[in-house]
Amino acid sequence: MPMIADGIGVPLENLRLVQNHAGGTFGYKFSPTNEALIGAAVKILERPVSLVFNQFQNITYTGKRSPAFMNIKLAADENGKLLALWGNNYVDHGPYSEFGDLLTMRLSQFTGAGYGINSIRNKSTTVFTNHAWGSAFRAYGSPQSYMGSEIAIDVLAAKMGIDPFDMREMNCYKESEGTTIPTGYPPEVYCEEALFKTARPLYEAAKKRVAEKNAASDGKIKYGIGVSLGVYGCGLDGVDTSNAFAELNPDGTVTMYAAWEDHGQGADMGVLVSSHETLRQAGIRPEQIKLVMNDTKTCPNAGPAGGSRSQVMSGNACRLAAENLVAAMKKEDGTFRTYDEMVAEGLETKYEGNWVTTFCADHPIDQDTAQGDPFATYMYTIFLPEVAVNTETGKVTVEKFTCVADVGTIMNRLLVEGNFYGGLVQGVGLALTEDFEDLNHDTTLKNCGIPYPKDAPDDIELHFNETYRPSGPYGAAGCGEAPLDAPHPAILNAIYNATGARITRVPARPERVLAALKELEK
């Protein structure tokens, strides 16, 4: 909102936004697109304005994930224990600076994340170009980071003759070793050892399936299993905050006011579940909870939907608002006041919940060294894709995708699973088909490589560990970014496992895979 207000010259308090249900936007609404244009037109014409983009405009007028060149080196002892990481990375952020500083920082926060690496020297540089403008996109900064470190650890494991799953497991975060995140502080919880324990039999079963398929193949189609580990933080860097209201109505229902932005991820269910878990103490049923959402006139500021912050930040705000209301309703004998009793006793019927991560102020991120403790909590995911590679055409198919994740207490399993199904399919597109380099070509959904339904594996297997997060509402972390932080290097690693050809650039379209296969013949 401040960007829009500044851009069209309107005081922030005079700007009202009412969000329509938008479906999946995956972060690009962090940057104003058509809203500011509409605002300028309204000011000039002094009448309601509608702006509809055609497909070409929708693709070219909106931001894209910033491409990056990741140059990563890893060192390990003779047993495979990681000792050091060195990096020199460059990000093409297009012509505008917005969020460029944050993107640069993300590469330092997530490159090598998930592993106990005591010595890290990782320099990242963001440059301006006349290419597509860079904006926020799901798992901001981590897909670039893990293209570096998750392929590098695979290369190192192969050189040392160590199974890539074993290499990752032996180096994961361990409380007994006091391992830290790349920014120098311990994670909120140590859950990776248990995550690898859950994933181990799934990985062994996948290796067996792949071996059986290769044994039965004539060699034209080769099969492989890949692995990667992704970690992503929940929240905006440093101190973050969100607010919500809970109001008891005359008919005994409760209205929740929340600006928990809905971008297809299920914000309405998030508000409902986060508030009902507390409101049910007063006998309030889910159908008695009304939602007023995403109108800046009636809802308090909840912050943006991004960085998987909403479940943690807005979920806590809804929880606190509900707790404050329930506390006011509760009588000394343990029963609860009605609306009429509240009014008769002069008690307020509307309460605010304000959640602030003040603890993040204790160790703010140093802009020069990237050291600090920026996030309330983290999400952890192990990716295990199984691929088939046609060695004559270079076509890669993801036949099965197994995913093992820990996103804390699961508040609504259907929504979490939906986030993971969608994110993994986006990862398939990122790894194999999607590109946006040629503005004379990549300006239709077909030409920019959006995957078809047939490109998505029918067999997606999800497993969740639920390690309680002390800073999350009822122990929950976020989940939105988790499935898209590192599925693509796992797919590229699976191509290597199948063929011995190492792909280090996305998308791994058939011509790129064929070129890598021909290199093996030299």
Name every feature range the model reports, one short phrase each.
Residues 7-16, 43-50, 78, 103-221, ...:
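C-terminal catalytic domains of large/alpha subunits in multi-subunit enzymes
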Residues 2, 23-46, 50-52, 267, ...:
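Thiamine diphosphate
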Residues 1-8, 105, 225-260, 265:
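Conserved beta-alpha junction segments in alpha/beta enzyme cores
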Residues 18-21, 55-61, 254-260, 374, ...:
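Cysteine-centered functional microenvironments
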Residues 87-96, 261-263, 401-408, 466:
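Short, solvent-exposed aromatic-acidic interface loops
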Residues 1-3, 26-32, 60-66, 71, ...:
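Short acidic, glycine/serine/threonine-rich loops at helix termini
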Residues 83, 255, 396-399:
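Generic structural signal for well-ordered beta-strand positions
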Residues 48, 55-120:
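Active-site cavity-forming subdomains of large catalytic enzyme subunits
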